[in-house]
């Protein structure tokens, strides 16, 4: 088996050097050799999996930012965030208030109670 492997490697190097084609027999052997090298003994094919690496710098448009100049705006952003939270809470409470509020006196005065 080792002599076949050496022969295939030699044929491939000769093919690359000359720019010509190696023998068809060596091409078939190289294909078989590649299959053997990529398979585990159990018969499972070994494949390289490309994993995505998280890049946490993508949201930063410029890494050379003067961080001291953003301190004035920090208070404004915090204020905007609290305002947004307050508005969303008001929207949520608007729909739940009718369930929690007691009936008004005018409801009794109108005679709507059977």
Swiss-Prot record:
Top-level lineage group: Eukaryota
InterPro entries: BEX (IPR007623), TF_A-like/BEX (IPR021156)
One Pfam family cited in the UniProt record for this chain: BEX
Keywords: Cytoplasm, Ubl conjugation, Zinc
Main subcellular location: cytoplasm
Biased amino acid composition, Basic and acidic residues: 13-38, 63-75
PTM description: Ubiquitinated. Degraded by the proteasome.
Family: Belongs to the BEX family.
UniProt-recorded name of the protein: Protein BEX6
Organism: Mus musculus (Mouse)
Gene name as annotated: Bex6
């Amino acid at each position: 088996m080792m002599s076949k492997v050496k022969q295939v490697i030699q044929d491939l190097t000769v093919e690359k050097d000359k720019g010509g084609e190696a023998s068809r027999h060596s091409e078939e052997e190289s294909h078989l050799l590649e299959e053997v090298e990529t398979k585990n003994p159990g018969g499972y094919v070994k494949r390289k999996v490309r994993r995505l690496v998280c890049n946490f710098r993508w949201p930063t448009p410029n890494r050379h930012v003067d961080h001291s100049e953003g301190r004035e705006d920090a208070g404004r952003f915090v204020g905007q965030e609290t305002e947004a939270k307050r508005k969303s809470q008001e929207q949520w409470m608007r729909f739940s208030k009718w369930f929690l509020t007691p009936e008004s006196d005018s409801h009794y005065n109108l005679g709507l109670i059977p």
